[in-house]
Amino acid sequence: MGRTPLTLLKSPLLPSLSMSTTTPTWSTVPAGALPRLTVDGQETGLALWTARTRRERNIGLLGTDSIDGALWITRCNWVHCFRMRHTIDVVYVGRRGKVVAVTTMAPNRMGMPRLLATAVVEMRQGDASRLGIRRGSILAAAPTVPLSRPDPASAGAQNTMLGSTH
């Protein structure tokens, strides 16, 4: 009647340790339906997940082997990579989407809080450099192009400046 070590590690807040994925484990939205990250007004093609709830922010990219896109974490000015499986680029974003700092974090490391940051964007290692993201860049979300005409009742419901405060 002894417990196996794996049953002790299960938690409703943490993803399965054996799961192999390149999307946030808490999201059910397919990458094709997500907005795209823009840098200085230019669309990058990167799918953009947004972690808005406490649960989503706490889990972040835990349980992933990489990410096919980027994760925008709202109401956040620091992150850690404890229990992460891969190195990531971390972009600290301030008001109106302005980049405050960019760094790369290896697994089991803790980032420094950035007092001017209101959000953090996590992406695959090397993506920030490849996309030209640097201090002073402006990040935003470009809405996906609908395959059919949008419902007028829901038009304009998407905020394209995620996590910003005006």
Predicted regions and their residues:
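Compact, glycine-rich, soluble single-domain proteins
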Residues: 2-166
